[in-house]
From Swiss-Prot:
Binds 2 Zn(2+) ions. Homodimer. It comes from the Bacteria. Its cofactor is Zn(2+). Signal peptide: none annotated. It catalyses: Endonucleolytic cleavage of RNA, removing extra 3' nucleotides from tRNA precursor, generating 3' termini of tRNAs. A 3'-hydroxy group is left at the tRNA terminus and a 5'-phosphoryl group is left at the trailer molecule. This is Ribonuclease Z. InterPro entries: Metallo-B-lactamas (IPR001279), RibonucZ/Hydroxyglut_hydro (IPR036866), RNase_Z/BN (IPR013471). Zinc phosphodiesterase, which displays some tRNA 3'-processing endonuclease activity. Probably involved in tRNA maturation, by removing a 3'-trailer from precursor tRNA.
């Protein structure tokens, strides 16, 4: 699992930072990419990456401020230009109003999509998705409008198969190995091969928390609890706490406080005000690291493997 930042700015695009969009790449786990927010020009940012729009199967919108949604109509339309045999439906999660925004933009512009969008409008906290390998939880953050944070939980994966031990026990390599890997007891030439004897302990799944705009809050701590990675906004430097509170945002140290209280492993800071460029970005990093050492301020196109 990898994360890539397509836009890391706050409020409006700048020469160095586009508006908010984050790609959670789950190609090895499920051959999919999940997109979190879709600010203006997200599709242009994607052109500078290896991301294929058809691989984006889910979009999670944190809130309806323009710097988080103005790229949606364009991206959704361009995604429709793929060949018909590559079309896949898309799941779109977000606050109440996201469906009206998207459908109105498509209708007024005369845009027709070659795939279906399944809308999931969220008005309360809870689990919004679950399958055999992942689940997603959401809760309400403390911003100036209704705003969500998302907690992506990978379920524990089955442990490694000890192929050498199976061979030494007399089982030839082949389809029977696959059955044991699936947890099936296998009989072969009078011998019983029990999966519990040949499969190691389950591997703990990863936890990734991606928050929308927010003041420091207990909800943010709960969503991030024990996460391998927390993505938190840091619109302002540490000494601008009053301004951050007034505008529904966080400072570097407040974001780091959340990470520390939640026991997070890695903290990545985004949603950076355009006032912070050059050496000032280093100042933001140092401020946060005084509270949570494993912290970094990301820039557009920054990519990192999780865990």
């Amino acid at each position: 699992m990898e994360i890539q930042f397509l836009g890391t700015g706050a409020g409006q695009p700048s020469k160095s930072r586009n508006t908010q969009a984050i790609a959670l790449k789950m190609l090895d786990e499920r051959n999919e990419i999940w997109l979190f927010d879709c600010g203006e020009a997200t599709q242009h940012q994607i052109l500078n990456t290896t991301i294929k729009p058809r691989k984006i199967t889910k979009i999670f919108i944190t809130h309806l401020h323009g710097d988080h949604i103005f790229g949606l109509p364009g991206f959704l339309s361009s995604r429709s230009f793929q060949s018909s045999d590559e079309q896949t439906d898309l799941e779109l999660y977000g606050p109440v109003g996201i469906k009206d925004f998207v459908l109105t933009a498509l209708r007024i512009s005369g845009s027709r999509l070659a795939y279906r969008i399944n809308f999931h409008e969220i008005d309360s906290a809870g689990k919004i998705f679950e399958d055999d390998s992942f689940e997603v939880h959401t809760d309400l953050l403390d911003h100036t409008i209704f705003c969500l944070g998302y907690r992506v939980v990978e379920k524990n994966r089955i442990g490694e198969l000890d192929a050498n031990a199976l061979k030494e026990a007399g089982l030839p390599f082949g389809p029977l190995f696959g059955k044991i890997k699936k947890g099936e007891i296998v009989q072969y030439e009078g011998k019983t091969f029990d999966p519990k004897d040949y499969i190691g302990a389950d591997k703990a799944g990863k936890i990734v928390t991606i928050l929308g705009d927010t003041r420091k809050s207990n909800v943010a701590v709960r969503l991030a609890y024990g996460a391998d990675l927390l993505v938190h906004e840091a619109t302002y430097e540490a000494n601008e706490s009053k301004m951050a509170k007034a505008h529904g945002h966080s400072t570097t140290k407040q974001a780091a406080d959340v990470a520390k209280e939640a026991g997070v492993n890695r903290l990545l800071l985004t949603h950076i005000s355009a006032r912070y460029v050059g050496p000032l970005v280093g100042q933001l990093v140092r401020e946060a690291q005084t509270v949570h050492s494993n912290t970094f301020v990301v820039k557009d196109f920054y990519e990192e493997k999780i865990g």
